[in-house]
A protein has these predicted regions:
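Short, Lys/Arg- and Gly-enriched loop/turn segments at beta-strand edges
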Residues: 66-70
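A broadly conserved detector of short glycine/acidic/proline-rich loop/turn motifs that flank catalytic sites
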Residues: 10, 65
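A detector for short, charged/polar N-terminal pre-domain segments
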Residues: 1-9
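A basic, amphipathic helix-loop patch mediating RNA/tRNA/ribosome contacts
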Residues: 12-54
Length: 70
């Protein structure tokens, strides 16, 4: 399980999280794969590309789990 720190930001959009963590090569790929139902947030399929991911949430994507921290 990987960790991603929001640092001083209150949230990050799901498609940006997938891009900056390297789980997707580009924002376009991230958006397409989210729309295809490949991303889960806290165990539920998430189809909103701009879903705000907050500290404490867990994102699952392509056999990877990312815990978002402050």
């Amino acid at each position: 399980m990987d960790e991603f720190s929001l640092q001083d930001h209150p949230w990050i959009e799901l498609h940006n999280l997938l891009k900056v963590t390297g789980l997707c090569a580009s924002g376009g790929e991230a958006k397409a794969r989210i729309a295809a139902g490949e991303a889960r947030v806290d165990g539920a399929v998430e189809l909103r590309k701009r879903c705000k991911i907050l500290a404490g949430q867990i994102v699952e994507f392509d056999r990877a789990r990312v815990v978002v921290t402050l």
